[in-house]
Curated annotation (Swiss-Prot):
<dbReference type="InterPro" id="IPR045097">
    <property type="entry name" value="Thymidate_synth/dCMP_Mease"/>
</dbReference>
<dbReference type="GO" id="GO:0005829">
    <property type="term" value="C:cytosol"/>
</dbReference>
<comment type="function">
    <text>Catalyzes the reductive methylation of 2'-deoxyuridine-5'-monophosphate (dUMP) to 2'-deoxythymidine-5'-monophosphate (dTMP) while utilizing 5,10-methylenetetrahydrofolate (mTHF) as the methyl donor and reductant in the reaction, yielding dihydrofolate (DHF) as a by-product. This enzymatic reaction provides an intracellular de novo source of dTMP, an essential precursor for DNA biosynthesis.</text>
</comment>
<feature type="binding site">
    <location>
        <position position="169"/>
    </location>
    <ligand>
        <name>(6R)-5,10-methylene-5,6,7,8-tetrahydrofolate</name>
    </ligand>
</feature>
<comment type="pathway">
    <text>Pyrimidine metabolism; dTTP biosynthesis.</text>
</comment>
<dbReference type="GO" id="GO:0004799">
    <property type="term" value="F:thymidylate synthase activity"/>
</dbReference>
<comment type="similarity">
    <text>Belongs to the thymidylate synthase family. Bacterial-type ThyA subfamily.</text>
</comment>
<feature type="binding site" description="in other chain">
    <location>
        <position position="21"/>
    </location>
    <ligand>
        <name>dUMP</name>
    </ligand>
</feature>
<keyword id="KW-0545">Nucleotide biosynthesis</keyword>
<feature type="binding site" description="in other chain">
    <location>
        <position position="177"/>
    </location>
    <ligand>
        <name>dUMP</name>
    </ligand>
</feature>
<dbReference type="Pfam" id="PF00303">
    <property type="entry name" value="Thymidylat_synt"/>
</dbReference>
<feature type="binding site">
    <location>
        <begin position="126"/>
        <end position="127"/>
    </location>
    <ligand>
        <name>dUMP</name>
    </ligand>
</feature>
<keyword id="KW-0808">Transferase</keyword>
<dbReference type="GO" id="GO:0032259">
    <property type="term" value="P:methylation"/>
</dbReference>
<feature type="binding site" description="in other chain">
    <location>
        <begin position="207"/>
        <end position="209"/>
    </location>
    <ligand>
        <name>dUMP</name>
    </ligand>
</feature>
<dbReference type="InterPro" id="IPR036926">
    <property type="entry name" value="Thymidate_synth/dCMP_Mease_sf"/>
</dbReference>
<dbReference type="InterPro" id="IPR020940">
    <property type="entry name" value="Thymidylate_synthase_AS"/>
</dbReference>
Amino acid sequence: MKTYLQLLEHILQHGVEKSDRTGTGTLSVFGYQMRFDLAKGFPLVTTKKLHTRSIVHELLWFLRGDTNISYLKENGVTIWDEWADNNGDLGPVYGKQWRSWPTADGGTIDQLSDVVQQIKSNPDSRRLIVSAWNVGELDKMALMPCHALFQFYVANNKLSCQLYQRSADVFLGVPFNIASYSLLTHMVAQQCNLDVAEFIWTGGDCHLYLNHLEQAQTQLTREPLPLPSLAIKRKPASLFDYAYEDFEFVNYQSHPAIKAPIAV
């Protein structure tokens, strides 16, 4: 994961200090890309320990089309707590847009089901896209989508995925996003009887919050460890039937966790 450390270093060296919605302040750069060969290991950051339970359960929660944090709370995941209302609701965030994008005639579109079918029936399509950026519902969301749009690509019987992340909290959020979309790529590949190729992360406003700079510098002093591999223990009937127990990150070794405050 030297690629990720290079992003931290790039922001520390070239970032411009900017104000932000949370009032915390950031060092920011605009436009950055990282590529991960999924055949060479699963891209979990090793220079600090990641909470893999949160990564897996959050993705399963998205795939359910869920927008209430009760499922996350039941499974010990607290990463969305700060944005939920008193009933645990977040408004029409990722899961709603992925699974039930509203149409003008009152219907809905299951973007994920559609894209899986397209990959199976027309893998050379250039329209293998899922978007969470629904302009008509942004004002109803507790947090507008940071990871806004992703696209699949099939070549040589291998599946790649590229994510566009408009706003990237590089210390806390991006390691989760890399792992989450890499996991999704593995799952979709299994459902479509494909091997995995690359996960490509493209960021817009890539920033370190000013109260994360010391933590980022600490992380840069640590030597990356070998990447783990991902084992998926069964192939369920659909993309939406996976369970937490189906996944194992084999030989995940890491340096200790580094705590940092979240900007709300």
